């Protein structure tokens, strides 16, 4: 039975508050993704406003 057993080892390191992606901590990656998402959303809002104005001008 000992050959079929599975051991799970959980190691906690309190020095690193965030998991790391390569050399950058996850907090930097989260800020990068948040910045890109913000830029995308702002661009989407601007394009929506422009298209609504063009559509309104075309219909009126």
From Swiss-Prot:
Keywords attached to this entry: Host membrane, Membrane, Transmembrane, Transmembrane helix
Domain of life assignment: Viruses
Main location: host cell
Compartments where found: Host membrane
Membrane topology: Single-pass membrane protein
InterPro entries, A to Z: Herpes_UL2
A cellular component term, taken from the record's GO annotations: host cell membrane
TM ranges: 33-55
Family: Belongs to the HHV-5 UL2 protein family.
Designated name of the protein: Uncharacterized protein UL2
Species of the source: Human cytomegalovirus (strain AD169)
Gene behind the chain: UL2
């Amino acid at each position: 039975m000992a050959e079929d057993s599975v051991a799970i080892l959980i190691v906690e390191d309190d020095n690193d508050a965030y998991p790391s992606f390569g050399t950058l901590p996850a907090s930097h990656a989260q800020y990068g993704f948040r910045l890109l998402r913000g830029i995308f959303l702002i661009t989407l809002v601007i394009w929506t406003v422009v298209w609504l104005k063009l559509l309104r001008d075309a219909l009126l």
